[in-house]
């Protein structure tokens, strides 16, 4: 899972997008089609949307998840560079990413509102950090709407701005911007399924440019869902993507996996 908030410490965690982009000016965004909503519900505020997401899957969304991730970044030479990451989630608020090889002890750990970069099994000092993809793609289905809303406001989303649009043939609720505005931080939610689909935000190192992050190819897992492919687009070009395999939910995970002081000693889900 892309980790956009550890931007300076780990280049591949979101800042990799910047390396793939050239200095051309941001093109004018294409007009967004405004649609009539087929649902009887008309949301007028972002917190209403978050509450509906929580209510739809209350008691149905998995609380643990593991997967192997192929991470592909487009280099300045226009060639794709691939890495393998191993990820474990305890929802809400905990995400562990091990970089291949796991034995090297390198990775990133999110624990609630803090993030740790791990090098050689040792945690660097934490930074206050929120991962909006973790919040919107997973935590929202376990947290209260008030808690999720507070986190997103900290990240610069204006929850008072809501409109409806379409994306890839499906109706969407857009929170954070008015119709036609693609320059404000905003997230898109599928009207029918109430699943997070898209996030548009300024790039980490240049706030005048945008990146478009997409959760794609959703598939059902029991009564919940998972997106096994995440894409990042910049200036109309795919520059980064993640593909998940060996996906498992309801996994028994050692609590120590999410303790930065026990990175190497925790019982790892990848090891027998």
Region spans (language model):
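Bacterial N-terminal signal peptides that target proteins for export
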Residues: 1-10
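C-terminal motif of bacterial Sec signal peptides marking the signal peptidase cleavage site
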Residues: 17-20
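Bacterial signal peptide processing site
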Residues: 22-25
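Intrinsically disordered, low-complexity, charge-biased terminal/linker regions in eukaryotic proteins
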Residues: 29-35
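N-terminal mature ectodomain segment of secretory-pathway/periplasmic proteins
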Residues: 35, 41-123, 156-160
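Flexible, processing/modification-adjacent segments and terminal tails
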Residues: 41-46, 116-183, 203-209, 253, ...
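Gly/Pro-enriched, hydrophobic low-complexity segments
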Residues: 104, 168-264
């Amino acid at each position: 899972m892309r980790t956009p908030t550890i931007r300076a410490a780990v280049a591949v965690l979101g800042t990799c997008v910047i390396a793939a982009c050239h200095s051309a000016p941001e093109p004018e965004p294409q007009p967004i089609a405004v649609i009539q909503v087929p649902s009887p519900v008309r949301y007028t505020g972002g917190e209403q949307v978050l509450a509906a997401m929580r209510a739809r899957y209350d008691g149905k969304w998995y609380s643990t998840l593991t997967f192997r991730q192929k991470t592909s970044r487009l280099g300045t030479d226009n060639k794709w560079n691939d890495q393998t990451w191993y990820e474990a989630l305890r929802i809400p608020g905990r995400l562990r990413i091990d970089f291949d090889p796991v034995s090297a002890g390198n990775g990133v750990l999110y624990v609630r509102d803090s993030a740790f970069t791990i090098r050689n099994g040792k945690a660097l000092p934490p930074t206050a950090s929120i991962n909006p993809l973790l919040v919107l793609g997973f935590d929202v289905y376990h947290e209260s709407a008030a808690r999720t809303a507070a986190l997103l406001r900290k990240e610069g989303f204006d929850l008072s701005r809501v409109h409806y649009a379409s994306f890839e043939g499906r109706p969407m609720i857009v929170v954070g911007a008015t119709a036609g505005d693609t320059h404000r931080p905003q997230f898109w939610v599928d009207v029918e399924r109430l699943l997070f689909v898209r996030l548009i935000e300024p790039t980490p190192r240049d706030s005048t440019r945008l990146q478009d992050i997409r959760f794609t190819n959703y598939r059902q897992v029991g009564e919940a869902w998972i997106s096994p492919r995440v894409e990042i687009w910049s200036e109309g070009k795919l520059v980064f993507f993640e593909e998940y395999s060996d996906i498992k939910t309801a996994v028994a995970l050692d609590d120590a996996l999410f303790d930065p002081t026990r990175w190497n000693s925790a019982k790892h889900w990848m090891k027998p």
